[in-house]
């Protein structure tokens, strides 16, 4: 407390009230509750008979004066006084003996919550859920948990004791009159410790950080007398401190909200001591009251003001007399009553047009703006007939006219033009692909490739080009769900939601909340390049997230706008040992919201991917250098002034919105140089605006100076420690979590143009300076300083449609920075899972405080933009293709490739087949009609994959035959179709050497990027489960090669083997080597038919044969069934000679 502290305002609480005839002495009654608002510059006072008033101060000729701002009744007068106040963003919560009242700061009632068991309430506090939930207790046996969002009681808890005070810090501390303080767990509300203060009766208690202070009274000669000391308890170590002496007899004790070891103690007569708990022998003493006695006492959240009330009803506000006082650090502006304009009288007459009345200005949807689906056709004009149709009508005797029948409609039918004129208020779901195909064969196909989804049609009368400014969430930001038919996810038309060449990510997979963040990482060129370079190395770590990011980036580039899925990446995240501990997984009971998980996941990914990169590059860690801010952390003890330092690495900056200085970059003289360069412009013109700029916030967050309490090795005790950073280097990729926690911070982001697309940094004299806008442009033009310019890559935004909808994150990315050639202008895109849409820069960088808030922002060094590295393709480590995973096995079904003779090259033909098991079955929901709807399709896992040579001397011989070690539970092995049994995939009983999924996947990924041509049957579904994206030019699917589109039916491998190759396969069960070998035989037969010009004719015969035999493979009369061996038998005399090809009856003209 400074020497200039004194009384700065005084006000009587009865001023402004009408006299109460039933209680003439009411004006002398003292307040029963007083508290500073934690969100606004208001002082709240509660009195008897349920009266609540808020007071606001203002300066009048330099003198601080108070006046009543608002007043209302929180409960009926007969229910007694107001006991306590709490505050949150919504309003003020006041506590009576029988109810909890919640009101807006303007006085409007939001909720009045009561219960039959609320008989004598005395105290309340917030729980572990922050300001959205409170715990209420009192001189009764029951405590209540109240959800402030739902405005209802959610839980009744037996009270361990009768409490009159509760405060929350790390724990909930509840004080009872008998001298004990119970320490409750804020989640379970169970007592974890009890502190006996040794007082016969407690009078007051306060909690801040790790300390509890209490004051009480002792029983002396039959009466209670205030104790001459303050009790102190250490919450961190759960032990008592020596009491603090206070000879004037303590009545109230408070902890200072800013100085963690400072306590303020006041006596009944008004003597006040400001004491340091660590050094209580030198208190600061003040006398705050004169001839009256103290009634109540409180300290403002900013620590700049104190309030005392006396027994005569006066409020005394203390603070520094030489400067302005603020109750809160960054408070909401006080809302005053708006003055209503005087409208001119309207001359109502028959000649006065009603449209001259006009409408007041409004920003929300009017009640009259009904959505289209609530409007009725009754009274609407009839449907319009086409005039040509009317002219062609024929007379029907003397009765009237009749119209000719038109193809596609019944007689006298026309199109209902009324329904066509109605606006569509939501996105129309596309048809399933199977439905489109069926309609196509009926001649009803409608081309939807050019259909533009109507985003402008929302139930709001406000017309704007910026969707983010609308009060209702536009369609393009809504959470889209995949609809499943009996054919599964493959039947969903993803192309309807994406007309760009950028691929979206499907969201029906566990942990798919990470899709937006994965998109942001993929569109950051430096991270993309390093991930692919690492994936091309020999890394086989099963938990390497960097490899998976590289595989995902490669898949999305090869997809060219087709839908992708991050199955393997998200599966590895689920199995990562650290992810569950950090509560980053879906289904975690103590996991936070998806917004908090996104911010935690960014920190987790950058940290662990940097470790992954270091495992294969033990020297210089390029990924750490590219993503980590290197600094020296200086820790200084405020007591002994000793200073220690330690190196620190930080991958993600958490933005801190505490007040910044007027010129955060002062010290490098750049701002002054810029001002001097502006001719004819006064220096005062460049003064910064009241709102801090993004660059100021970013600079302060990177340097982050803070004061905390910790152990000092010099003092050998816990002391206040000042911490600051000396920045050594900043990374090429700068990631930041927005950490928005208040309405003020949301409004800051919602300020137009607040987030710049470029920022610049200067590191000078152990400090970092950040610039944007005109200053940055001047620095770039000047070229005097070593300036690092960063471009905004994109951001992850949280969309909150409303209380009945689930919030979800989306990515907003400038794809121009990741193009190989720099485009002429920016290319902002919205990535809402599989819905991808180009948007304007204004749309991208406009935020809405009610439903669109940023979570993560990503900047990259501008010099690295558009540097897309492809050299990793020439540095692929292919050693795994030539390594035997089962060196000790005797009956191997494969023969490894010869590195010298059979190294895969672009155009090498290989045949592949995979077998799968069921990890999760369908999930259904029953609709109102009693019909089943699929809400989640079957989830398969790769069980076995086989790759066979399809060219060369050893054609038909497999070189990969891997059985997979599956981590998740298996629901069904599909033995009849997969040939896999439980003993094949159980590590304890399998006779095969089970390999990790990553090892099997990497072999296929290497073959893909070596340019091999994949031959198989039904490869689309195989590649989907494997999560491998193969370009069309590298796939020859025999299911598509032997398909006549007009026939609709696609033929099975067994039927084609019999009808084309005269081979019987899958006689007992499926075998992947046999199926892959059959596919490559069919492929070469197709090539033969195509080159000879007989393909079209033979396809007709194949379908005719199928119709005759029901499309099932049948034995040819007089021919024994043949079955290929696994591996296929090869003639030793003629290496690579296959079984002789015998044409079936249909190819012989039968």
Curated annotation (Swiss-Prot):
Ranges for region Disordered: 1118-1150
UniProt source species: Pyricularia oryzae (strain 70-15 / ATCC MYA-4617 / FGSC 8958) (Rice blast fungus)
Region of interest (Linker), ranges: 326-471
Enzyme Commission identifier(s): 3.1.13.4
GO biological process, any: mRNA processing
Keyword Lipoprotein: no
The protein's name: PAN2-PAN3 deadenylation complex catalytic subunit PAN2
Activity regulation, free text: Positively regulated by the regulatory subunit PAN3.
Names of required cofactors: a divalent metal cation
GO cellular component terms, A-Z: P-body; PAN complex
